[in-house]
């Protein structure tokens, strides 16, 4: 094949990935024109709809997109990939790699990363609510007589969206890219039409209007910043979804279609307001002629459902990562596609999200009321991403500290400005994502610390495996036919389940495997590096299986690899899996306060069973109980 053909294929692949990325990565930020400008000129802010104010706000929107999306995320943050993977937990894992595990900075970076992940969930319950609701509210413009149906229709759409999750979205997901391309082309065309009617709006490109607006209104302008940040909702997805599509396709989509379309639409809305300030009641839908209003409502609703789907899938992926990294208890994870590795479904997360989202929709009743709650989760995550990226630049990339200080300083001023402006909205609704984030942060930190204490207690009371096996082989118990697999969290200690089996049954299987799963701080582990097998003699094997934080442990696949390496065969129905069922008992021992220990014990009790998590046949499992005092 010629170099020209290779180049053509690469180009085609890049374009295909870019279109696919548009359907997943840019749904959230792509639907922000539905409510952003309307919220900026909310009557509660008291900003007059004068030409200078309109130009000033549009200028702020424009430069926010350029600086935060176009420069910070696309040019800088997306460079900080963890073996190709992005997202706040991947960035945290990367930033922790060169640090001393016992240093304070390590604890701070870990806490920041976990809090950033928790704030994502705060964002994940608001995005579907505000996006779908704002789209359906277009009925108030298209067919005012149906305005009383906005809330019921929103609820029905959201319930249907979460109901279909268990069946997977791989089939309809192929349509997401083309539909979102149509969406961006449509909003760009609507913007261009009105820009042509009021070309004066183009002067908002000049940052003078942004600075003039800020200096003229000062305090009010700072409040407006809390609404301006709504144009950036979903910017974090550019980085978080990098592992699915790669940096190049996302950059191509951002610069060629997404950012130009967003800018054109915001400028079009600004032009409409210059022509008719009364259009502020719903500037997005009033961009369309009356005959196109209803089709635009339908397209908007589909686009917001796609945006919501991206957030929901992101919540599943983040939960899976957090489980593998040890910050969240085991949960049942179902794979909804045999072909697409990343297509997963987490039932607990799905139904909790739906419950909270429905409560939000019913409680807030309109997208206007909900807008105040939106920005704070986004800006908090932006600040955390900037700080973690700074650590990576200095510690991992070894960049000049002065250069990093200059770059990060500019980004932090912008991020903290937006975050501070959103703190003013805590009383109006900002308490919601903050409360969700704080509660989840407490639970995740409690789980992480509790597991650390359990490991310490287990290690202190544990028996080293190597000398134990030597003694066992010197004075072997009665051997029985078949294979026994002992799942253990520490490959240097004797599994408690083995001690119980020897104590009560006084037998050892002719083939005994001690299997440990280890999660590394990279997203994926190469197949040839995954499984190591140590032959301890006389049919005893120590197996260590390493997985990345984006992977799900697979007992069956590990056994197949062990069989390949050692020339064995395994019959699942002739194999027994021995597990230790730990019962955590809160005490007044040093570690955590007794009430946190009780919370941890409750989480531990309600974690998914290892049989469900590791997909082990339940009828082949022997569980032996053990108590651990913490």
Curated annotation (Swiss-Prot):
Pfam family, one: K_trans_C
Keywords, sorted A to Z: Cell inner membrane, Cell membrane, Ion transport, Membrane, Potassium, Potassium transport, Symport, Transmembrane, Transmembrane helix, Transport
Gene Ontology MF terms: potassium ion transmembrane transporter activity; symporter activity
Chief location of this protein within or outside the cell: membrane
Ranges annotated as spanning the membrane: 17-37, 51-71, 105-125, 144-164, 175-195, 218-238, 255-275, 283-303, 344-364, 374-394, 402-422, 428-448
UniProt key word Cell inner membrane: yes
Entry GO CC: plasma membrane
Catalytic activity annotation: K(+)(in) + H(+)(in) = K(+)(out) + H(+)(out)
InterPro entries on file: K+_transporter, K_trans_C, K_trans_N, Kup
Membrane topology category: Multi-pass membrane protein
Compartments, record wording: Cell inner membrane
Role played: Transport of potassium into the cell. Likely operates as a K(+):H(+) symporter.
HAMAP family documented for this protein: Kup
Entry's family note: Belongs to the HAK/KUP transporter (TC 2.A.72) family.
Protein's name according to its UniProt entry: Probable potassium transport system protein Kup
């Amino acid at each position: 094949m010629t170099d020209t053909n290779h180049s053509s294929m690469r180009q085609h692949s890049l374009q295909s990935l870019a279109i696919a990325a548009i359907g997943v990565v840019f749904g959230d930020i792509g639907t922000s024109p539905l409510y952003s400008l309307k919220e900026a000129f909310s009557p509660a802010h008291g900003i007059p709809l004068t030409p200078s104010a309109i130009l000033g706000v549009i200028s702020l929107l424009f430069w926010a997109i350029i600086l935060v999306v176009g420069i910070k995320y696309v040019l800088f943050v997306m460079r900080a990939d963890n073996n190709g993977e992005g997202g706040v937990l991947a960035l945290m894992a990367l930033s922790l790699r060169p640090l001393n595990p016992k240093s304070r900075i390590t604890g701070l970076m870990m806490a920041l990363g976990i809090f950033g992940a928790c704030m994502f969930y705060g964002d994940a319950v608001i995005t579907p609510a505000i996006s779908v609701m704002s789209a359906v509210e277009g009925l108030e413009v298209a067919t005012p007589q149906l305005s009383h149906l906005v809330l019921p229709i929103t609820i029905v759409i959201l319930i249907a969206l979460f109901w279909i999750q268990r069946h997977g979205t791989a089939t309809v997901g192929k349509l997401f890219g083309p539909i979102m391309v149509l969406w961006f082309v449509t909003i760009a065309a609507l913007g261009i039409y009105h820009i042509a009617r009021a070309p004066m709006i183009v002067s908002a490109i000049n940052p003078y209007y942004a600075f003039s607006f800020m200096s003229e209104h000062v305090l009010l302008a700072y409040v407006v910043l809390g609404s301006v940040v709504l144009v950036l909702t979903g910017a974090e997805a550019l980085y978080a979804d990098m592992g699915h599509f790669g940096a190049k396709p996302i950059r191509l989509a951002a610069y060629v279609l997404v950012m130009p379309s967003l800018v054109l639409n915001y400028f079009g809305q600004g032009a409409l307001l210059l022509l008719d300030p009364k259009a502020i009641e719903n500037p997005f839908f009033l961009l369309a002629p009356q005959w196109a209003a209803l089709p635009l409502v339908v397209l908007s609703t589909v686009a917001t459902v796609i945006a919501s789907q991206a957030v929901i899938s992101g919540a599943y992926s983040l939960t899976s990562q957090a489980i593998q990294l040890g910050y969240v208890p085991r949960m049942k994870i179902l794979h909804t596609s045999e072909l697409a590795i990343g297509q997963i479904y987490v039932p607990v997360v799905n139904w909790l999200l739906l419950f909270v989202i429905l409560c939000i929709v019913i409680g807030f009743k309109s997208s206007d009321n909900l807008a105040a709650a939106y920005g704070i989760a986004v800006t908090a995550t932006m600040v955390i991403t900037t700080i973690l990226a700074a650590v990576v630049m200095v510690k991992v990339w070894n960049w000049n500290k002065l250069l990093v200080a200059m770059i990060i300083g500019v980004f932090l001023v912008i991020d903290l400005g937006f975050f501070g402006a959103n703190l003013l909205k805590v009383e109006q609704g900002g308490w919601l994502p903050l409360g969700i984030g704080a509660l989840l942060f407490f639970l995740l930190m409690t789980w992480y610390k509790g597991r650390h204490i359990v490991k310490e207690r287990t290690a202190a009371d544990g028996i080293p495996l190597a000398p134990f096996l030597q003694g066992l082989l010197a004075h072997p118990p009665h051997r029985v036919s078949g294979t026994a697999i002992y799942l253990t969290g520490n490959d240097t200690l004797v599994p408690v389940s083995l001690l119980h089996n020897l104590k009560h049954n006084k037998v050892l299987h002719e083939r005994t495997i001690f299997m440990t799963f280890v999660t590394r701080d990279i997203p994926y582990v190469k197949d040839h590096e995954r499984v190591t097998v140590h032959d301890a003699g006389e049919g005893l094997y120590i197996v260590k299986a390493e997985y990345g934080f984006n992977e799900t442990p697979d007992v069956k696949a590990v056994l197949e690899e062990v069989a390949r390496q050692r020339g064995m065969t395994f019959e699942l129905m002739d194999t027994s899996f021995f597990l230790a069922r730990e019962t955590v008992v809160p005490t007044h021992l040093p570690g955590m306060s007794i009430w946190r220990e009780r919370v941890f014990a409750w989480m531990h009790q309600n974690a998914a069973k290892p049989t469900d998590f590791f997909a082990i046949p339940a009828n082949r499992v022997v569980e032996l109980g053990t108590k651990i005092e913490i």
